[in-house]
UniProtKB/Swiss-Prot annotation:
It holds the Pfam family AA_kinase. The gene is pyrH. One of its GO terms (cellular component) is cytoplasm. Allosterically activated by GTP. Inhibited by UTP. This is Uridylate kinase. Pathway: Pyrimidine metabolism; CTP biosynthesis via de novo pathway; UDP from UMP (UMPK route): step 1/1. InterPro entries: AceGlu_kinase-like_sf (IPR036393), Asp/Glu/Uridylate_kinase (IPR001048), Uridylate_kinase (IPR011817), Uridylate_kinase_bac (IPR015963). Belongs to the UMP kinase family. One of its GO terms (molecular function) is ATP binding. Catalyzes the reversible phosphorylation of UMP to UDP.
Amino acid sequence: MVTPKFRRVILKLSGEALAGQKGYGIDPEVVYSIASQIKDVLEHRVQLAIVVGGGNIWRGISGSTKGMDRATADYMGMLATVINSLALQDALEKIEVDTRVQTSFEMRAVAETYIRRRAIRHMEKGRVVIFAAGTGNPYFSTDTTAALRAAEVEAEIILMAKQVDGVYDADPLKHPGAKRFDELTYIDVLNRGLQVMDSTAVSLCMDNKIPLLVFDLNTEGNIKRAILGERIGTFVGGDLNG
């Protein structure tokens, strides 16, 4: 068995990743495909936690731009992440992957409340932990949740699963000549305003020296390739020269 490069990782999934070609809602076949990739990764004894967004159901910032109270809209977005997390848990458990959903605020009927030490213990026992409901606070994205939880559970890297194969200097769908970066520093991302994650999340990763790998989720087996240390996507870290 190939030894993984990373022992404990956070996988960040967008809500749109669960929607498939429809772009909204949840596509059970897509969720099952993601779950199968995750199961394949666990065979390498990797400790895995997941943060999933809610944009396939609701975006808080979109609601606030149309007159809705921002805090209320963000709480609705947090609930959307819980729906996605339960869908992913269901898919994982159907293929016999022991999974726990932990929410940032109490929802005892459907999930555990987030407790750092319990989350770490679950991972040490080989269970997948899905962190739902964001940070539990409005005005913070699920990218920031991923950075925060990665720092708390001492993850070695955040794997940013996207719909594109890395970070570009322009939208590759609109600009065919856009350049893809193999490596970037946190400062590069912040100074250039690159769409990796929001600036709060990038700063949190920089302060805690948590690297990022941005890669294409749509390529089968890429989660495994990322964890085994294959060169895919775009790596974001500190001083890449030293």
